[in-house]
Amino acid sequence: MSRFRDRTEDFKDSVRNSAVSIGYNESKVASTMASFIIHKPKERSPFTKAAFKTLDSIKELELFMLKHRKDYVDLHRTTEQEKDSIEQEVAAFIKACKEQIDILINSIRNEEANSKGWLGLPADNFNADSIAHKHGVVLILSEKLHSVTAQFDQLRATRFQDIINRAMPRRKPKRVIKEATPINTTLGNSESIEPDEIQAQPRRLQQQQLLDDETQALQVELSNLLDGARQTETKMVEMSALNHLMATHVLQQAQQIEFLYDQAVEATKNVELGNKELSQAIQRNSSSRTFLLLFFFVLTFSVLFLDWYS
């Protein structure tokens, strides 16, 4: 069995001698020899840089949500305006991350389109593994962003539920105003009241009673209007929460439909490829059958000719 010899040192000596013969100084020779030990980091492609940038943005969004989680959910830590500003910042983060992912998807599609040659066939420089790797990177980023968005949807649903609970109408018992007529006072002071005042007093009491009845009716009407306004506000908040949940589910269904469409397109391509291979197999089978028939026919005539010749 032959032995293997390590020629690394001989190679380094040859490189050092070549560098000295070319005219390298000591610093250049040292940097050249150091390159064998410490390799330069490979330069990242634009796609990889954009993917890492998107991942950093998603991580930053997750940290922002974790930092302001209590401020957004707690009822008494922040005001509604501050919660709305937090929600707007998170929405801007999500929109920016989604745009970055769309840019990555468009770059993959452009690369696939440019890699196709004549008649839509793959060119020589087409790398299917690289394309598949990039699709996997985009899928991982999309799932990461979707998980962070789902967490924020849970926080938003909690906030909406708290708003609904606070906006529920609290019915207060209606106070019945009972007016005590000053009978005793009237009776007590009847001796000192003049006859004209005695005749005008029932009229005043009647007017006062009418005013009290109108005031009570207005209070009841205003209370009913307030209850109706609170119910309308509650329904509007519920509709807003339902609209948001519906938009989230519609987005998820759109992603699922797009994924199913891609799978259907891929399945159609596989079926077409299978049909081509099946037709080729049928042609090969028919040609082999013809060859066997011709072979047996020639063999039969050869045997008959040999028998006749002998």
Swiss-Prot record:
**Gene3D superfamilies recorded:** 1.20.5.110
| Localisation per UniProt entry | Membrane
Which loops or segments lie on the Cytoplasmic side of the membrane, by the record?
Answer: 1-289
The record describes its membrane topology as:
Single-pass type IV membrane protein
Quick one: a GO biological-process term for this protein?
A: protein transport
Q: Does the keyword Protein transport apply?
A: yes
InterPro entries, A to Z: SNARE, Syntaxin-18_N
Q: Is Coiled coil among the key words of this record?
A: yes
Mind listing the UniProt keywords for this protein, alphabetically? Coiled coil, Membrane, Protein transport, Transmembrane, Transmembrane helix, Transport
Q: Which GO terms describe its cellular component?
A: membrane
Chain ranges passing through the membrane: 290-310
Q: Which residues form a coiled coil?
A: 77-114
Q: Which family does it belong to?
A: Belongs to the syntaxin family.
Role, per record: Vesicle trafficking protein that functions in the secretory pathway.
Q: How does it assemble?
A: Part of the t-SNARE complex. Interacts with MAG2.
* Name of this chain's protein: Syntaxin-81
Name of the encoding gene: SYP81
